């Protein structure tokens, strides 16, 4: 965001100036007091363990210019303060007003989808970063706090703002898109996720496609397999995937073929995507990037800058064993993609540690059973199951010839897994974040090094 006075920020946020100099400069916004810097607006919100107002003075000591808080909370800190009926809502109001003022100077790319949002954002940011000043979310900042913070913390010189729009319930993406005012948008994937709020696949489709209604122009991208479901409106969109406007196929090892039908050309790029979901993310990222960078040579130079976010197909090699951590989140589509990758691997044995996929609604038992059955059909040699969905997963996985072992807790699980592992194994960890498989994998890695030595 460009520098603005505290008075203007208060007006844009529909807040009132309680204390402080209205002419003081506001350069950014933070919700974590430890990230405060000179000129920052510290937004004091209720957190999981405490209220941000408890850390307002700490933010001010680090240079924060003012605090945005709920009514009456100004008495609980010493510095400049503005109050709004709801600080959380004021944060979104402020970000929306800033975007309205700056949209002509800063393009905004909105990314949503059931799988790969954060990874696609990271890819877009990395590739664009070689030629444009881009700003992307620092993590999965995709809710009513993360999206506005990403907007407000962008440097004034930002040319392309990359935003991740998430959802749990109908209408949330529309609200975030209205605030973000995107010039470009991409739906990475539509599959069974957040069914507790979105109910079914059609609910997911409607919610994701709602983002594209807020984009003027042609830069509305979606997976081609949904083209028929849109009917006559399909001509309003661009499509990724087989026979779509942009398609990316695996080619020789370490490269992909880009079929850019929109511009009537084909070219190779140096990229090894790994599982199918990462290939889809790369395809989605390219769909957006090609509107800014058309030269394949320039793309080839930028691709090595791509860094996949933590716990997304994160590979650790220890003691001759490959540990693959893809446990930031999980869904039927994402799990299938990782199982297929594991099945194609050349490791001596294929091992999967899988746990509950959350927010799958009333049919969650069937989704887990089907995932277990896919483990069986993919000929995974050894399957460990854990969490609330363990029974359903085990039932499906037991339809094959592989061994299935139930894990009761992480401590027991480390011992059970380490007793089975052999040099040359590849071990996939996949579950929703609440299962804590990242911690199990970390403890397993430590034990392997202690007992077998680093190799």
Where are these regions (language model features)?
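Short amphipathic alpha-helix with an adjacent loop that forms part of the alpha/beta core around
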Residues: 178, 413-420
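Residue-level signal for inorganic ion chemistry
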Residues: 9, 40, 59, 94, ...
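Active-site beta-alpha connecting loops in nucleotide-dependent enzymes
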Residues: 47-49, 308-311, 328-402, 452-455
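N-terminal leader/targeting and accessory segments in enzymes
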Residues: 1-93, 97, 344-345, 374, ...
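Acidic, Mg2+-coordinating active-site environments of NTP-dependent enzymes
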Residues: 10-12, 74-77, 184-322, 347-348, ...
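ATP-dependent carboxylate/acyl-activation modules
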Residues: 111, 310-314, 434-442
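Phosphate-binding loop of NTP-binding sites
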Residues: 10, 90-221, 229-233, 290, ...
């Amino acid at each position: 965001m460009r520098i603005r006075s505290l008075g203007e920020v208060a007006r844009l946020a529909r807040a009132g100036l309680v204390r402080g100099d209205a002419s003081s400069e506001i350069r950014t916004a933070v919700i974590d007091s430890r990230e405060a810097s000179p000129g920052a607006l510290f937004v004091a919100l209720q957190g999981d363990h405490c209220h941000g107002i408890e850390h307002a003075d700490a933010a001010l000591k680090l240079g924060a210019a003012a605090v945005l808080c709920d009514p009456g909370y100004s008495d609980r800190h010493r510095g400049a303060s503005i109050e709004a009926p709801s600080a959380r809502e004021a944060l979104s109001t402020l970000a929306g007003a800033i975007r309205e003022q700056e949209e002509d100077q800063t393009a905004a790319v909105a990314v949503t989808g059931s799988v790969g949002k954060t990874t696609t954002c990271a890819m877009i940011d990395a590739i664009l970063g070689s030629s444009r000043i881009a700003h992307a979310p620092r993590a999965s900042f995709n809710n009513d706090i993360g999206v506005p913070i990403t907007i407000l913390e962008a440097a004034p010189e930002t040319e392309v703002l990359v935003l991740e729009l998430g959802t749990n319930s109908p209408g949330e993406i529309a609200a975030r898109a209205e605030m973000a005012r995107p010039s470009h948008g991409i739906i990475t994937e539509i599959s069974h996720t957040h069914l507790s709020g979105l109910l079914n696949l059609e609910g997911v489709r409607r919610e994701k496609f709602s983002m594209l209604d807020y984009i003027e122009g042609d830069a509305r991208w979606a997976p081609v397999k949904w083209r028929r479901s849109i009917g006559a409106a399909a001509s309003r969109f661009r499509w990724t995937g087989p026979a779509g406007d942009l398609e990316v196929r695996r080619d020789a090892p370490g490269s992909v073929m880009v079929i850019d039908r929109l511009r009537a050309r084909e070219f190779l790029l140096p990229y090894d995507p790994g599982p199918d979901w990462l290939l889809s993310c790369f395809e989605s990222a390219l769909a957006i990037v090609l509107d800014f960078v058309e030269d394949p040579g320039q793309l080839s130079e930028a691709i090595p800058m791509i860094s996949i976010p933590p716990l997304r197909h994160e590979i650790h090699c220890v003691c001759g064993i490959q540990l693959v951590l893809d446990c930031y989140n999980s869904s039927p589509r994402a799990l299938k993609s990782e199982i297929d990758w594991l099945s194609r691997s050349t490791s001596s044995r294929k091992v999967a540690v899988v746990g509950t996929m959350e927010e799958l609604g009333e049919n969650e038992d069937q989704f887990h059973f089907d995932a277990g059955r896919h483990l069986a059909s993919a000929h995974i040699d050894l399957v460990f199951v854990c969490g609330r969905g363990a029974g359903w997963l085990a039932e499906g996985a037991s339809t094959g010839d592989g061994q299935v072992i139930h894990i009761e807790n992480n401590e027991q699980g480390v011992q059970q897994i380490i007793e089975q592992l052999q040099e040359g194994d590849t071990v996939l960890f996949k579950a929703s974040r609440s299962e804590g498989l990242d911690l199990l994998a970390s403890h397993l890695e430590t034990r392997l090094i202690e007992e077998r030595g680093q190799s």
